[in-house]
């Protein structure tokens, strides 16, 4: 069996995610557009689990004219993504990458923190601790904009969402490719229900607003007031 790994899809990683999650390009575009309401000069913008760095580079290109003095940091632990980082850092003087574990990152003076499908790969204990760190590191008025896969607490609804999701993925992948990925992610990804996810974020002190949903995937703006 050929197992799915993030490394094997690295060359076309963003395209792979777009084919795997219906509406991903709209989610990505929404986060990019929302960033302009929060990025501020002389603050830090952080993308947690930045993979190829596409979102960070998009935010720089969108915001640099009006907000030229913001600094952008990508956090990534998967070494297979590191290859292009030095090139990116040379091209964008506002950009740097933290090549390591998000639990070791010091969130400070942040106007915006983003994360796309990252928390779901952490242990529940680490999720809460990281969310708490993000809240403390954000400036008042800042935001944590993130998206996660959730699961329904109703088994019937969960089955509906799962099979509709598989039907969508069959437009782009074979049954074997879908199964291989599921087998691999089963041991890595442990989603929350929406209720559990919202509670973790609210317990950290955030005010939350859902701005996007497709199947069991949600996008949330969490505000530090």
Task: List PLM regions with ranges.
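Class I SAM-dependent methyltransferase SAM/SAH-binding core
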Residues: 46, 52-103
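Conserved beta-strand signature within the Rossmann-like core of class I S-adenosyl-L-methionine
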Residues: 141-149
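A short glycine-rich, Lys/Arg-flanked "PGG" loop and its adjoining helix->strand segment in the class I
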Residues: 128-140
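Core SAM-dependent methyltransferase catalytic element
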Residues: 204-225
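Short conserved loop adjoining the S-adenosyl-L-methionine
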Residues: 104-108
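C-terminal alpha-helical "lid/dimerization" subdomain adjacent to the S-adenosyl-L-methionine
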Residues: 149-200
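A conserved beta-strand element that flanks and buttresses the S-adenosyl-L-methionine
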Residues: 114
């Amino acid at each position: 069996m050929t197992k799915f790994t993030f490394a094997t899809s690295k060359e076309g990683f963003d395209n792979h995610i777009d084919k795997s999650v219906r509406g991903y390009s709209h989610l990505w575009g929404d986060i990019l557009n929302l960033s302009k309401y929060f990025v501020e000069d002389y603050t830090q913008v952080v993308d947690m689990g930045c993979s190829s760095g596409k979102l960070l580079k998009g935010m720089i290109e969108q915001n640099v004219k009006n907000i030229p003095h913001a600094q952008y940091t990508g956090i990534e632990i998967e070494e297979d993504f590191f290859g292009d980082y030095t090139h990116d850092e040379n091209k964008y003087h506002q950009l740097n990458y933290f090549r390591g574990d998000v639990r070791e990152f010091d969130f400070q003076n942040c106007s915006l923190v983003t994360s796309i499908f990252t928390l779901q790969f952490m242990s529940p204990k680490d999720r809460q601790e990281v969310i708490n760190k993000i809240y403390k590191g954000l400036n008042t008025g800042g935001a944590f904009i993130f998206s996660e896969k959730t699961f329904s607490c109703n088994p019937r609804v969960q089955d509906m969402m799962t099979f509709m999701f598989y039907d969508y993925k069959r437009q782009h992948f074979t049954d074997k490719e879908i199964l291989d990925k599921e087998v691999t992610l089963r041991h890595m990804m442990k989603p929350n229900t929406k209720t559990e996810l919202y509670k973790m974020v609210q317990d950290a002190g955030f005010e939350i607003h859902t701005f996007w949903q497709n199947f069991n995937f949600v996008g949330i703006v969490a505000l530090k007031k």
